[in-house]
Every structure is written in structure tokens, then in C-alpha cells.
Amino acid sequence: MLPDTHDGWAIREDVLPLPGGKDANDGYARVQFVGTTGAGKTTVLRQLIGTDPNKERFPSISAAKTTICDIEVILQEGNFSGVVTFIPRARIRQYIAECVLAAITSSIEGMVERDVIRKFLEHSEQRFRLSYILGNPLLLRESDNAELLDEEDEEVQGEEESLISQEERDDLLAALEKYLAQIAELAKVSHAHLAQAAAELDIELGKASKQDRDILQELVEDQLAEDDHFHSLIDAILDDVELRFSYLNDSELECSRDGWPIKWSFSTSDRDQFIRTINRFSSNYAPNYGRLLTPLVEGIRVAGPFAPEWWETESPRLVLMDGQGIGHIADSSSSLSTSVTRRFKFADAIMLVDNAAQPMQAAPCAVLQSLVASGHESKLVLAFTHFDEVKGDNLIGTAARKDHIVGSFDNAARAIGKSFGRESELSLLRLNPDRIVFLSNVQKRVEAKARFTLFELNRLIDVIMSTITPVGPVQYRPIYDVANLVLAVQKATQEFHDRWRGILGMGSRSGVAPEHWTRIKALTRRLGNFQIDEYDALRPVADLIRLLQTQISQFLNSPLSWSPEIPSDDSEDRQVAIDTIKKEVFDRLHELSRTRVLEEKVSGWVEAYEHRGTGSTRIRARDMVRLYEEAAPIPNEMPGPDANEFLFELRELIAQSVIEGGGELLGWSRTNYESVIES
């Protein structure tokens, strides 16, 4: 039995430690994959580990969000081994409750059956899909499954084995239709409650304003929260979900005190058996809907003699780290999930996979900005997929197509230079051409005749392995004055509060639209009940990290002086010295921001979530504004002990980072600062 405390990364690390790392001399390079949904990062990973796209299909790919957990692959000799960690029971129950609620709401609104089923079987975040676990009635009702494919490939040779018998299909369909009937009954009761509430509030349903509809929807949610039939349905579905673990060998499972699986591990010398087994946790193969455990998985780590088919020498020593796509964000200043940014420190290379047909849109630019602000841009490797789709009357020949893509990258670098300085722009531009590769048709097996792509893939591995070449000691020491830090903190915290007041509808800010109250409520539950620091694209912890890091990065870009002398503005040594400190700051900011916004405010987030009844949306928003002001007060504008302590913690964080990174901070010592506070 394992303890209830849950850290999936630590559990996987205990079973199957990652080689490589900052101080390792084992020749391994760690690669973190980052990219937008559908750009092809998992497809590139497939090429690097040599899994067959038609027969093995590991990891799974599709046009939608497919990689919904962390995946780590170690290329090493010996047996094939794997460890899988699972999402805790309480969080799965909440996902189920949100799916059932969405289905009931859609039924009340008069949506057709197909839409009600979709709401029930696919969570709005598209990361939790009950259809994988319980099956899909629309597919189960079909007599011919010939068109059910794992992915969007044109050809599928040697289809994945179907695990489900006709008898089991019938049982799955019967269970789903029972759940849908209960959802319909709950919707009927809720609609009657809605009509009664509307009459009491003198609201005409057909002409209700948005504000009135929100009030009525919240009343329905409150009614369901008190309905025993609603909770009984959720519990029944959760029990059905838990039954899927019975298909696993008990000897390979370890569970928490409540009996819910925490980890599963497996080892074999048989590659085919290993791939078939591990696909139960990562597959999206439609004929096996009803048996797949994919949505319950938090992370997968595998190791074995994987190798690229086209690599002609000894298998490269690689650790490949994949995760959820960064999404299609609308603004390059948007925050990346902490699930992405907290992994930067573990990587030797950070591979940004982008679509060459639409290069350097908002999301990839947000990655570049984050890497520059955090001092990790020297780890960047750019892989442009879909190079075969880059076409135009003015793009004749490979060189012209490359120039077109590189031009987009140069524009992005120049835009970043305007915010972060000429040195940051130059550090990005130095990556061309050595750190940029172009890939065509990598979703298929790469044939010998595809000489261009084979050359680029081989070059990609060479580039990755070059990132572990030892760097000499920093020769220059930047010197800073702590007095110049206050303005940076003021600007960052002011922007943080302005942004979140706009999101909460408590003020207006250009480019920030108020979020629907249901999403705000869901965020407070994630923060309070599950200690998860985000809900979909609502990321208060990541926002605070990004805004503080951006302003502190600009502070660090302009040292007061240097020792022993001032390096030239375009010197790589200058940027290396500053980036070393930025990395230290970025790592510490993750801990500070999570502690102040989440861990010290758990009871406040629970209280904000639990508000019910008319006017609760406004009360919740006011609570959140207060929580944010306590967590990140604006220096000199929000006076009091909270503001003093916050500024002290940031100054201490910067001081530790500067000293650890080889620099010097004037005007700072804990003793002097504490004596000022006491006086």
C-alpha cells in the first residue's frame, strides 16, 4: 500500500529513474517536447524511438488532443520496462460529475441526443473522455466497425487487436443507455425546478437575459448538488470506471489506502507484448472503447531498446519527455502551463515542434518568450513539421521554402527583442541554421528515397546530442542593485491584478474578456479541493510566474556593472552569465508562486468555491480578488505586513539566485532587511 500523497513524477522516478541530468556524465541527453495541439510533436517522438506507425502506434496520435498525460521514453539496452501512474480517485469523481452536469444542462437546453452524449462522454477540457473507458453508444450501435480507426491515417495495415467481444459490446451499450436514461430523468426534474424558479423570479425563459440565465443555471446546479439521485449516478459511474482496473494483473498494481490504483509496472523482453500491454494506457483505438484506461493515466514512463529505424550507428542515448500540447492560444503573452515550464530545468534540449505550413503563430511565440525570459533559450531546438505542405507560387525549391519559415522565426525573434532587449534577440537568431530542422511526412515510415527528411532527422539527433557538451565556467559576474527591483515587482503585480480583475468581471482591461462563472467556480474547486493550479486556460499561478519573470528578466538584463570587466553587448558570454541567473530565478518562482497563490490559501479557495445562491458569483469574485491581493500585493500600493513580506521574499529569492548564478546583489542582506521591518 502506498501513501495517499500523490506525486506521479516522484513515483515514476522511484521505479524507473531517468538517466542524464545536470550533473550526469552518462552521455544521455534529455529532450522536452513542446508544441501546439496537432503540430506533430508525438509523431516526431515516434520517429526517434522507432515505433511502427501502422502496427505499433505508440504513443497514439490524432488531430485532436491525444497526449493527455506525461510520457517519458528512455532509449537503453535490456528489457522493455514501464511504469504508469494514475489520477487520484477524488479527481476522477469530479471529472465524472462535471461530465454528468454538462450532459444534464445540454438536455435542459434542448440539445439533440448526439450532443448530450458528447457532453457526457467528453469533458470540456478534452483531457478526460469517458468514451474510452465506458464505450460510446453511437459506435456500439453500429453493426459495421470497419471505419473505426485509431488515427487519421489513410492506410492502416495490421490493425490493433480488438479486445472487446460482441457480448461485452452489448453489456457496454446497456450500461450506457441506463446512464443516459438517468441523465434524461435528472434533466426533466431539473427543468421543472428551473421553470418554478423562473416563475418565482418573474423571468420568462424564452426571453431571459444572459444574467438571468446564469442565475437560473446556478440554481439548477445547487438543486443537483442536493439531489441524492445525482450523486448516486456519479458513484455508479465511478464504480464502473474502477472495474476497468480488473483487467490488469493485480501483482503489477499498487494502490492507495482507499484501494484506488496509484501505479502499475511491467517488464518483458518481448517487444510486441510490451507495446500491446502499454497501449492499454495510451491508446485511442476506437474499437477498444470500453476497455481503455487512457483517461485515468497521469503519466507513463517506459525504457527499452528503442531506436530510430533510419539511425545507422549505435542507438543514441536519449530521454524523451512528451506531454500535453500547449493549445491554440490567441495571444503570445499567454501563460504556459506550469506542467510545461517546471520541466524546463530537467531538459538539456527543449524541442519546439511547429507546423511549417503555419509557422510561428501565437502559441509557439509564447514558448519562445517563456524560454527567453527564463534563460533557457540556449536549449531550444526547432523542428518544423509538415514541410511538404509549404507551397506557393513564390516558393520554388527547398531553399525558398526554408527561407519562408526562417523569416517567420526571425520576425518572432525581433518582436521578442523589443520586449527583452537586443541580447535576447541575438541569442535566438544564433540558433539559425544549426538548431532548426525541417521534416516532411514523418507520420509515415520514412523510406530510403526520402533523402531530405532522413538527412534532417539524423541532423536532429546530432543537434540534440550536442546540447550535453559541457559549457565552461562563467567568466563574467553581473552586479545588480536591489533598489532597482521594486519597480519591476510593482509592474508585474499590477498587471497580474488588472488581468484577473478583467477575467473575474471586476474591472475592464483591453484584450481580457470576463470568464463564465461556471469556469471560475471550477477553477476555485481545482485550487481548493485538489490543489491543482489551473483549470483549462485559467492559470493564476502560471500568470504570476510569467509576469514576475518577465519583469525580473528585464531587470537582470541591465546589470549595474560587471566584474572583472564589461563584456560586449553581442557577447555570448554576457548572455550566458545573465541566463544562468534567470534559470535560478525561474525555478524558485515556481515554488514561491504556488506557495503564495495556492498552498497558503487552500481554505480560502474552498470557501470561494462553496458560495451558493443568488449573488454568489459576485461574492466569489470578490473573494478571489482578496486572495490574489494577499498572495501578491503591489509594493507601496497595498501597504501592510503582507506587502512587506512578499517584497522581502522576492528580494531574498533574487539574492539567492544571483549569488547561486555567480553574480552579486548590492544593498541586500537578510539581517539589514529584518532590522528595517522591526523598526
Model-derived features: positions:
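Non-catalytic alpha-helical scaffolds
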Residues: 1-72, 77-360, 369, 374-379, ...
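Conserved N-terminal catalytic core of the sugar/cofactor nucleotidyltransferase
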Residues: 363-364
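Acidic/histidine-rich, metal-coordinating catalytic segments
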Residues: 385
